[in-house]
Amino acid sequence: MIDKKQKQKIVSEFGKNEGDTGSVGVQIALITGRIKYLTEHLKINKKDHSSKRGLLKLVGQRRSLLQYYQKKDLEAYRALISKLGLRK
């Protein structure tokens, strides 16, 4: 999992201020970090089906947040996906 220091780094990078953990951009960035971690975990542990299910759940959650963010603020959405390196 992502440790506390990595989460704080993501929050400070994508948030409006240091304690901004609830904004959509920060949530998407945190979920992306967890997805990257689980992807690497599943490359090593191919038969870990519960982690695979959790990964698919996170991907769906991120997708819905991205759709919401695209409708809410298109320019910030484009900046976020380019910063995170997501395809869209």
UniProtKB/Swiss-Prot annotation:
One of its GO terms (cellular component) is cytosolic small ribosomal subunit. Belongs to the universal ribosomal protein uS15 family. InterPro entries: Ribosomal_uS15 (IPR000589), Ribosomal_uS15_bac-type (IPR005290), uS15_NS1_RNA-bd_sf (IPR009068). PANTHER family: RIBOSOMAL PROTEIN S15, BACTERIAL AND ORGANELLAR, SMALL RIBOSOMAL SUBUNIT PROTEIN US15M. The keyword RNA-binding applies. It comes from the Bacteria. Gene3D superfamilies: 6.10.250.3130, S15/NS1, RNA-binding. This is Small ribosomal subunit protein uS15. The lineage of its organism: Bacteria, Pseudomonadati, Spirochaetota, Spirochaetia, Spirochaetales. One of its GO terms (molecular function) is rRNA binding. CDD domains: Ribosomal_S15p_S13e (cd00353). Transmembrane segments: none annotated. Part of the 30S ribosomal subunit. Forms a bridge to the 50S subunit in the 70S ribosome, contacting the 23S rRNA. GO terms for biological process: translation. One of the primary rRNA binding proteins, it binds directly to 16S rRNA where it helps nucleate assembly of the platform of the 30S subunit by binding and bridging several RNA helices of the 16S rRNA. Forms an intersubunit bridge (bridge B4) with the 23S rRNA of the 50S subunit in the ribosome. Keywords: Ribonucleoprotein, Ribosomal protein, RNA-binding, rRNA-binding. PROSITE patterns: RIBOSOMAL_S15 (PS00362).
